[in-house]
Amino acid sequence: MNDDIELPVDVDLYKQWHIDLIQKHRAESNSNSILFAIENDNGEHVGVCNLYGIDERHGRFEPVGIEINVSHRNKGYGTAAFRMIGRYMFNERRMHKWNSGYVEGNNASAVMHKKLGFIVEGVRPDSIYHDGKYRGEVMCGITETQFFENEKTLPLLM
């Protein structure tokens, strides 16, 4: 059993689906969330990212949902998007802490979080029902200082 949402296969339909999603989000949204499209250097739509749980009072934000088109996965788009989110939220929105997480067994997400300097803070057992069974949710976080220290170790991002 696969509980994932079926996405359009056609690239133009995929892009339109995300445009519709973004427009719907803007119409219903408040300032506690941001939804944006991800494009490659050629202007081709490769995915969408949803940033929500922005807490101005405590200077933190949490989870970021990201969806990269299957044909564009494992090319660094998710990592680049996360880096841009960190720069924006820490520099422009003056946030202090980024709380994130991923489903146990999602190795791509685990590798990305580690590469970006996130620290695993714990696991919520059996918290997410995915692909026919309950899985743990790995909780991790990074502070502004940790994020920018780690950024120094990564290749330049334009």
Describe the residue ranges of each PLM region:
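Conserved GNAT-fold acetyl-CoA-binding loop/helix
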Residues: M1-I22
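A short helix-loop-beta-strand connector motif used in the catalytic cores of GNAT acetyltransferases and
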Residues: L21-A37
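Acyl-donor (CoA/ACP) binding surface of acyl/acetyltransferases
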Residues: L35, E39-M158
